[in-house]
Regions:
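H-loop/switch region of ABC-family ATPase nucleotide-binding domains
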Residues: 205-206
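Helix-to-loop junction immediately C-terminal to a conserved catalytic motif
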Residues: 61
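Conserved ABC ATPase "signature" region
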Residues: 122-140
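Conserved catalytic motifs of ABC-family nucleotide-binding domains
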Residues: 165
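Conserved ABC ATPase signature
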Residues: 144-148, 152
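ABC ATPase C-loop
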Residues: 161-162
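Conserved beta-strand-loop-alpha-helix hinge in the C-terminal portion
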Residues: 224-249
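Catalytic Walker B motif of ABC-type/P-loop ATPase nucleotide-binding domains
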Residues: 169-172
Length: 258
């Protein structure tokens, strides 16, 4: 685990009867969620399309928006605080590599989040170098981001999140748009980051097999946005695989009902 000064420890998540309904929608995206994720746990979040997985990740990152964007009920806490009040405690990486590259040079792009948090320049660039090393992106800080592959761009996004020293790492289908080489690069980078930082992980992914040996828990949301299953991967996928597939969840080796 990272013991350097200013490094955040792993975060914990507590949801009690939590739900969210997007503005203009009748049905909540997530509803009546009771969930506790302990500091340092590694969770694979599954569910059919529209079950609220991305909504939950955005809520944990504190970027769902205000009252004009929707309404919530219950409580969702990150280290005992509202995620919106825990700025910098959660780092979110999305599925589209191109949409996450902001600046023209590798170093500047990784530094962007730290600068927004008001971290001093000297500390920011120390974090940038540490983060780039952690994700295995062996490139000079001046390297053009336009010349990166898809897998390299996702590792760049991961480095940008890591530089902010989050206690909770949120990955929303990070390999969805990558070829097999890019998938392997990102998965290996995440494993290195977790080994180095001990951060809590929540990853949403349809490529379940990529993450099974890295996570210690599987949480499943149903089509109605409610908690459907929660437990060790072997229990959830092996013992409940057919029932989950019938509910629209992709499970390795079990055909979906269509």
């Amino acid at each position: 685990m990272d013991r350097t000064p200013g490094a955040a420890g792993p975060a914990r998540v507590d949801a009690t009867g939590w739900g969210w309904r997007h503005a203009g929608r009748r049905r909540p995206a997530v509803q009546d969620l009771d969930l506790r994720i302990h500091a340092g746990e590694r969770v694979l979040l599954l569910g059919p399309s529209g079950s609220g997985k991305s909504t939950l990740l955005h809520a944990l990152a504190g970027v769902l928006g205000g009252d004009d964007e929707g309404e919530h009920h219950g409580r969702l806490l990150l280290d005992g605080r509202s995620p919106a009040d825990a700025r910098g405690r959660a780092g979110l990486v999305l599925q589209d590599p191109d949409s996450q590259v902001i600046l023209a040079r590798v170093g500047d792009d990784v530094a962007f989040g730290c600068e927004n948090l008001g971290i001093p320049r000297e500390e920011t660039w120390r974090r940038v170098r540490d983060a780039i090393d952690a994700v295995g992106l062996d490139l000079p800080l001046s390297h053009p981001t336009s010349r990166l592959s898809g897998g390299q761009k996702q590792r760049l996004a991961l480095a940008g999140a890591l530089a902010m020293r989050p206690g909770l790492l949120l990955l929303d289908e990070p390999t969805a748009n990558l070829d097999p080489r890019g998938v392997a690069e990102v998965r290996e980078a995440v494993a290195r980051v977790l080994d180095r930082t001990g951060a809590t992980l929540v990853v949403v992914e349809h490529r379940v097999n990529v993450w099974l040996d890295l996570v210690d828990r599987v949480v499943v949301l149903g089509a109605d946005g409610r908690l459907l299953a929660d437990g060790p991967p072997s229990v959830v996928l092996d013992e409940r695989g057919e029932a989950l597939a019938a509910a629209g969840v992709w499970v390795p080796g079990v055909p979906l009902d269509v």
